């Protein structure tokens, strides 16, 4: 039985309690199903709740898929899922809180904190200019000078009501919605039917909230491959939604195979679990081919695990063997900076669209703040392929219906991988090297930045 059923069961118990107290709302809800009957039991209340959430009966609700129950919760509550649920990273799911009091917990910064001229300092002494504002009450702050591209926030963040206290022209809800667009003409390809349908990609990362409405339809496989140590994180949903989310994704129709794996064990870095995950991905690739489907085109990994920097890690030999097997099967393992001969370090770079820019216009893109200053390395600029890598709206990590604006972003890798999936829709035998070469040939060169990928021209070239 799905863990979400308990949410509906709790609501039915609450309805019975209120009905017995003759509360008007509870009585009215029951009358819509049972008329003026007074001898109603918990079973009857369960039936009422099931009907209200779009099911014909309680039995139908209980037998529904987990994601169908999640979708029913959100659709019926009109995107106000303030339900008593908490994230369980072990199963990529949400469970009822023990006390049944789960709500959206807004945080408020202490008075006097400067949210405009902000620098985040980590325990190791490193700094970040990006400001975390997720689920925070900012209604009393003057944020008129805030750089909206330097802050993370979500659709539960409370902004000042007065426009004068927000950045000029900034409407939070509109901005979040606009930034779901992957950009650079990707949606024009979707309109042509080039959207990843009948293709597949895999992701190896940490925690993933499996049932998020942005990508649950695409998620064909979820498996945890590690020692079972506690885990957390936000990047899994960001990667999947940027790659194959139905509104945020570059390849919104692609199948996704997700493996949750630890990078460390007993405080030591290990590649063992990533290697196991990649071997399983190779097995799934072969199974898809036997079923007459396309194989898995690409594996998206944030960690630069194939780099020489990590060659002495625990499990490195197993990982190298798995990467070779994947390559022999035609699967691109996209991990860290690409390491092609002649340009081993700076072959790719992240760009983002200006706050008031046109997401489909490469002229409105700039290099991300934490990227190499390409103007200082003119010999590399023409060999650097740039992808959108920040300033994007992606799926949130703790609520099934929430979205967040990710300023620093992890979306370079999923953008690359998603575009590779689209490219293979046109040329199924495309290699990573060909993808990169043609991307450089068809992209839009911008001095001091590099070659900004042009998805439409890339696809046109592949069509011949």
Write out the residue ranges for each language-model feature.
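Intrinsically disordered, low-complexity eukaryotic regions enriched in glycine, serine
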Residues: 1-82
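Protease zymogen maturation seam
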Residues: 83-198, 213, 460-463
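N-terminal domain-start motif of subtilase-like serine proteases
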Residues: 171-201, 224-229, 285, 363-370, ...
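Subtilisin-like serine protease catalytic core
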Residues: 187-223, 227-274, 292-296, 378-381, ...
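Sec-exported extracytoplasmic/periplasmic mature domains
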Residues: 190-194, 244-248, 279-287, 304, ...
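Substrate-binding/access-modulating region of protease and related hydrolase catalytic domains
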Residues: 196, 262-351, 403-414
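Extracellular S/T/G-rich loop segment that most often corresponds to the catalytic His/Ser-adjacent loop
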Residues: 205, 328-331, 336-425, 429
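Caspase-like cysteine protease fold
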Residues: 447-464
